Amino acid sequence: MKTVSIIGGTGYTGSELLRLLSTHEKVEVLNVTSRKEAGKKLTDFHPQVRNLRNYNDLEFQNIAPEDIDTDIVFCATPHGASMAIVPILHEKGINIIDLSGDYRFEDIEMYESWYGLKHTGKIESAVYGLPELHREKIKKSKTIANPGCYPTGAILSMAPLVANDLVDERIIFDSKSGVSGAGVEASQTTHFPNVNENLGAYKITKHRHSPEIGKELEYLGNKKLKVSFTPHLLPVTRGILTTAHSYLKEDVSRADVIEIYEEFYDGEFFVRIFEEGMVSLTGVRGTNFCDIGGFEIDQHGRIVVVSAIDNLVKGASGQAIQNMNIIMGFDEKMGLSVGGMRP
């Protein structure tokens, strides 16, 4: 049995890690850290995992990274905090999955520009952890940068078309997310009366996930792209629906496009291609699946692809566990083989 620590266990991603790991056959959570809640019972803060595994016996701890000695560490800390922790764990040879944005960019200047932070802990061997595109690199690394929630759904929705050079450089992503994507701390934007029965765009052209989407698709297609991304906040708890638009470079049919997607994602358990019907948030809620559908082509040659993920699972904690499974040589589906909660 491999041992796990969760650094930053009071947020939504930490909570979701606990829920999902409760069914994992080959790992046990030993430490869950929180400076603010240190000494408090884990299940008093997260009652949803009461009576599962050893969770009733755990308390939040304030442990320095130097004192952590488990096989795996999930770093569920805010952007900027991870860069002070990950290098210490890396030196100790611990397997790390970092859920912040601190290690998603090889180009440090790009990170500093979009996140407004000075990066002080670069690790050359860190790998961007989108398994469907980088599985072989993930297998060889001990430090994984878990992708952002919006980029996961966006990249997977367009990857087959970009990889096959079927669309021009203009790609537009319109994404709508549940409120949990904003994190556990309440704000004026996420306050219930302001979100309920409402829908609004935010950071219309300057969301920090934009360059993450762009650099991954440019790497895949080996060319410069003009990627545009606009997020919206939905009055729902969890889920991201992404509508991706681009223009085809050649005359292909909808059937051709579907065949390309099915071939590209052949063998990928967590990507489900919908030839008919429409993908939905309820279909992926609580799961590590990315559902992709639409594939409609209009009279101008514009192709529209729609993806759906759970922002807390495939967009965060589930994908982190998927990455852990790959690193440790476990069955990739372990702890993640559940269907959506529909209705």
Curated annotation (Swiss-Prot):
The gene is argC. The active site is at C149. Its EC number is 1.2.1.38. Pathway: Amino-acid biosynthesis; L-arginine biosynthesis; N(2)-acetyl-L-ornithine from L-glutamate: step 3/4. It comes from Methanococcus maripaludis (strain C7 / ATCC BAA-1331). Catalyzes the NADPH-dependent reduction of N-acetyl-5-glutamyl phosphate to yield N-acetyl-L-glutamate 5-semialdehyde. This is N-acetyl-gamma-glutamyl-phosphate reductase. It is an enzyme of class 1 (oxidoreductase). One of its GO terms (molecular function) is N-acetyl-gamma-glutamyl-phosphate reductase activity. One of its GO terms (cellular component) is cytoplasm. Belongs to the NAGSA dehydrogenase family. Type 1 subfamily. It comes from the Archaea. One of its GO terms (biological process) is L-arginine biosynthetic process. Keywords: Amino-acid biosynthesis, Arginine biosynthesis, Cytoplasm, NADP, Oxidoreductase. The lineage of its organism: Archaea, Methanobacteriati, Methanobacteriota, Methanomada group, Methanococci. The keyword Cytoplasm applies. SMART domains: Semialdhyde_dh.
